[in-house]
Swiss-Prot record:
Protein's recorded name: Small ribosomal subunit protein bS16
UniProt keyword Acyltransferase, yes or no: no
Family (UniProt): Belongs to the bacterial ribosomal protein bS16 family.
Coiled-coil ranges from the UniProt annotation: none
InterPro entries from the UniProt entry: Ribosomal_bS16 (IPR000307), Ribosomal_bS16_CS (IPR020592), Ribosomal_bS16_dom_sf (IPR023803)
GO biological-process terms attached to the record: translation
GO terms for cellular component: cytoplasm; small ribosomal subunit
Keyword Lipid metabolism among record annotations: no
Pfam family, one: Ribosomal_S16
Superkingdom of the organism of origin: Bacteria
Disulfide bonds: none
């Protein structure tokens, strides 16, 4: 089973809010998820990025792949550097 770390859109129209989730690569964007590991709120100034580092590193060690957007958020939060150091 291919597992990806990606964003799940939440919120209202014109007021998006995203959850950073671990999901099967074949499931729909807002479909069933395996685990929620954080959130991203682009509406706040500055944009809020909160990621549970312990869960994120655990999933990356298990082989979960990051989408481009999730990779940018992980880089911004400093999680990607910690994973590459280990």
């Amino acid at each position: 089973m291919a597992v990806k770390i990606r964003l799940k859109r939440m919120g209202a129209k014109n007021n998006p809010f995203y959850r950073v989730v671990v999901a099967d690569a074949r499931s729909p964007r807002d479909g069933r998820v395996i685990d929620e590991i954080g959130y991203y709120d682009p509406v706040k100034q500055p944009a809020a990025v909160v990621i549970n580092e312990e869960k994120a590193l655990d999933w990356l060690k298990k082989g979960a792949q990051l989408t481009e957007t999730a990779r940018a958020l992980f880089r911004k939060a400093g999680v990607l550097q910690k994973f590459q150091q280990k």
